[in-house]
């Protein structure tokens, strides 16, 4: 799906059109980077995209950019920090069900293994793994009941080839491959 969405947003001459009209897509951490590209591709395919980020400003800027780059896009805002259960609960209240869930939220950065304490490990685990687990657990039953839905976890090459200076990150990305 990610490869297809990137194609939708970068190769206008040979676009494969997927009609997602009437579908609601939540893309976590979608104010920039990969998340924004995914949101843009889904919006270009007709989905109503829920843009998520940690600050109202970044979400509003991403929505404005999305509306500018995808004529007819109808994005919605969902401001929430997904590094803990409270932020996930806040996001769930804002979305009221979706057809497509793209678990893109994640943090990364190089850290020395010996200096990475339990609190740092826990923060990476909660943000990179548990945010997606919590959202999937809450949103997937309605998809199953409707008979249609998609859940995607965005992982990384670091899941299979864990960098020595980002073991804490690589482990969380490996966990995502199992979900």
Give the predicted meaning of each segment.
Residues 24, 31-32:
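Conserved glycine-rich cofactor-binding loop
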Residues 47-61:
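Conserved glycine-rich Rossmann-like NAD(P)H-binding loop of the short-chain dehydrogenase/reductase
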Residues 99, 107, 114-133, 148, ...:
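Catalytic Tyr-X3-Lys loop
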Residues 156:
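Residue(s) in the substrate-gating loop at a strand-loop-helix junction
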